[in-house]
């Protein structure tokens, strides 16, 4: 008999494949691999508590690679500071990082939100040619909106 969790993941896998969401399909593939090799009992608790922070660390490493390779240095930083587009990008980077911070907090305290975020992403990708940017920004936006709603209650 197929468990509810396996069926749910399988449905999400099909949706991810239809929507061509590589991150979702790879993530589900890894979860299936862990689940069916019985490593899940050991790894799932760790991923549930530390997975988001681990993912943020990997993303941070990827963002810092151009600095580590010398592709971006002080010269490029100085040149960028002369452009108002760079200042807009800087402000956008700060805003997105702050939104993502709220997203991490929301996903940590309210993990069932992830399902709604995944479905929202799949709908946007499948129906509106959107780009799957991951659950942190979506969760951050949700956190910001929820915080605003709480202020008026």
Swiss-Prot record:
GO cellular component, one term: plasma membrane
One Pfam family it belongs to: DUF441
Transmembrane segments: 8-28, 54-74, 87-107, 117-137
Keywords associated with the record: Cell membrane, Membrane, Transmembrane, Transmembrane helix
Subcellular location as annotated: Cell membrane
Domain of life: Bacteria
Membrane topology: Multi-pass membrane protein
Xref: InterPro entries: UPF0756_TM (IPR007382)
PANTHER family the UniProt entry points to: UPF0756 MEMBRANE PROTEIN YEAL
Family: Belongs to the UPF0756 family.
Protein name from the UniProt record: UPF0756 membrane protein BCB4264_A4705
Native organism: Bacillus cereus (strain B4264)
